[in-house]
Amino acid sequence: MNFSKVFALVLLIGLVLLTGHTEAGGLKKLGKKLEGVGKRVFKASEKALPVVTGYKAIGK
């Protein structure tokens, strides 16, 4: 397939998704899941970072 055809197809799908009058139920659920993952990663890094820096200080 030609690149321009693939690009046109992707552009068309993107326009349909962005301008469609569908409810945001599915996208909202996905966004909430991603937000939850981000919060969990942030909290885990807050807990682990002092441990790692303390471990590095002991190793010096």
From Swiss-Prot:
Transmembrane annotation, as ranges: none
UniProt-annotated location(s): Secreted
Magnesium in keyword set: no
Main location: secreted
GO biological process: antibacterial humoral response; defense response to Gram-negative bacterium; defense response to Gram-positive bacterium; innate immune response
Keyword terms: Antibiotic, Antimicrobial, Immunity, Innate immunity, Secreted, Signal
Cystine crosslinks: none
Pfam families: Cecropin
Signal sequence range: 1-24
GO CC term (a single one): extracellular space
UniProt keyword Zinc-finger, yes or no: no
Function: Putative antimicrobial peptide. Partially neutralizes lipopolysaccharides (LPS). Exhibits anti-inflammatory properties: inhibits LPS-induced iNOS/NOS2 transcription, nitric oxide (NO) and pro-inflammatory cytokine production in mouse macrophages and human peripheral blood mononuclear cells (PBMCs); inhibits LPS-induced activation of MAPK and NF-kappa-B signaling pathways in mouse macrophages.
UniProt similarity note: Belongs to the cecropin family.
Protein name: Cecropin-B1
Taxonomic source organism: Aedes aegypti
Gene: CECE
